[in-house]
């Protein structure tokens, strides 16, 4: 059976760390920022580590070769 291909959309959005955790950018920063406080905007910077169950699903279905 051939190897599963990595989903190209997931390849652009998620990264697997050396310890196997899945990292992604925070959601909610594309538009509508005028409604948010400065603190909310500041907290959306950088990346976040996904919960273990979500990360496991991402690795299993979308990043099979990671």
Curated annotation (Swiss-Prot):
Pfam families: Ribosomal_L35p. Keywords: Ribonucleoprotein, Ribosomal protein. GO terms for molecular function: structural constituent of ribosome. GO terms for biological process: translation. SUPFAM superfamilies: L35p-like. One of its GO terms (cellular component) is cytosolic large ribosomal subunit. InterPro entries: Ribosomal_bL35, Ribosomal_bL35-like, Ribosomal_bL35_CS, Ribosomal_bL35_sf. Belongs to the bacterial ribosomal protein bL35 family. This is Large ribosomal subunit protein bL35. The gene is rpmI.
């Amino acid at each position: 059976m051939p190897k599963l291909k990595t989903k190209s959309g997931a390849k652009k959005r998620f990264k697997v760390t050396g310890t196997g955790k899945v990292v992604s950018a925070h959601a909610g920063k594309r538009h509508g920022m005028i409604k948010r406080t400065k603190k909310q905007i500041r907290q959306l910077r950088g990346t976040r580590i996904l919960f273990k169950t979500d990360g496991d699903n991402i690795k299993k279905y979308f990043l099979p070769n990671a």
